[in-house]
């Protein structure tokens, strides 16, 4: 019984709603909104992004994991996503609050065919894609704060961290880390973030994380390949 209780406790901590009955057992009431490969592959309609989908309950940083995979040759479009980050980080090595099951904490591996000097446009491309995805969710007042934030009424909703590896002449790969606050409530934020952060839930957008992730990945793919096509046309 002790072993069963420990398993039930662990499942509840992951968001499973389980009812207990004295001397009768347990009943599963509701499954959590997890970003599992099975959940996402059933709904995701992309050609490249997320075809390789690396999912973890927890990790230090998705950018660190994605960088390791990229150095091993992971293909473009590989997505690394976690339910929580122990050491999430943003620009200038600032910490990024990444609690379990409350947001989208993910990194994307890109291998664009343009010169390194043009790499910063990937960050702008991502910001545009995210803003368009938010419009589809019903959030119309999200704005881009250059170079890597999306704000709503002055409060941060999204952080983007883009890291490039390559030479002066050629990009080997880009790891794009994105953090989106989805389910976090005002009272759940650390004191130092209460006045400067927001989430989709705090902006009255009620959406499952799986659906939000689907919209974001599909828009990221669309904007990225449009960007590559425009770059190719401009070079011809």
Per-region residue spans from a language model:
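Short alpha-helical functional segments enriched in proximate histidine and acidic residues
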Residues: 133, 137, 219-226
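Nucleotide and nucleotide-moiety/phosphate-recognizing core
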Residues: 98-197, 201, 207
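N-terminal lobe of the biotin/lipoate ligase/transferase fold
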Residues: 1-136
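Conserved small/polar residues in nucleotide/adenosyl-binding loops
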Residues: 230-236
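Adenine-nucleotide phosphate-binding core of ATP-dependent small-molecule kinases
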Residues: 210, 228
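Short amphipathic alpha-helical/adjacent loop interface patches that line ligand
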Residues: 8, 186, 220
